[in-house]
């Protein structure tokens, strides 16, 4: 079995982490190969899952917005693995395929309102290396959102900064569930 440049061990080899795997599957609908790669270091896997759980349990911004923030940041960084995960995640939270597909044209898209455009401006800027976030991004966001909401948005971007590097560096192989979503739902709409 191979799911990264390091090869890959069977899930069965990490039976001590099975409870965590089930929680992750319950949230995502499948177990990401990135968690199998992290499972080699159980403390890393537990700590990362706890951080992700804290960020995604925010009551200040909705799950669809979180997934779109993560998608924009991942598009900006170029991580195809995370792009597939977050586009699928956005769809699972109720974001329609046309809106997901239009994310690279969000400034002109009728699918995004001005507040969402301000959020995506930051996510795309912050996803770049070097980071291109500026005071203007936050001034624009403060027209629509509280500091607490913006902090949670930045947490999503930062979390995916880690995931984008982790998965691109290890060459994580995409799982069937997000791959099927991209192939069946987004590619017919022009997704590349």
PLM regions: where:
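Hydrophobic alpha-helical segments
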Residues: 1-192
């Amino acid at each position: 079995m191979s799911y990264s440049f390091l090869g890959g061990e069977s899930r069965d080899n990490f039976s001590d982490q099975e409870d965590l795997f089930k929680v992750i599957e319950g949230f995502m609908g499948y177990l990401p190969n990135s968690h199998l790669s992290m499972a080699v270091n159980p403390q890393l896997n537990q700590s990362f899952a706890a951080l992700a759980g804290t960020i995604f349990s925010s009551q200040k911004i909705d799950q669809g917005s979180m997934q779109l923030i993560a998608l924009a940041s991942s598009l900006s960084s170029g991580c195809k693995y995370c792009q597939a995960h977050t586009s699928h995640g956005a769809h699972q939270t109720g974001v329609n395929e046309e809106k997901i597909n239009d994310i690279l044209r969000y400034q002109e898209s009728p699918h995004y309102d001005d507040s969402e455009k301000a959020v995506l401006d930051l996510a795309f800027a912050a996803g770049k290396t070097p980071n291109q976030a500026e005071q203007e991004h936050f001034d624009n966001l403060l027209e629509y959102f509280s500091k607490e909401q913006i902090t949670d948005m930045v947490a999503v971007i930062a979390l995916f900064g880690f995931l984008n590097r982790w998965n691109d560096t290890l060459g994580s192989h995409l799982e069937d569930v997000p791959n099927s979503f991209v192939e069946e739902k987004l590619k017919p709409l022009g997704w590349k």
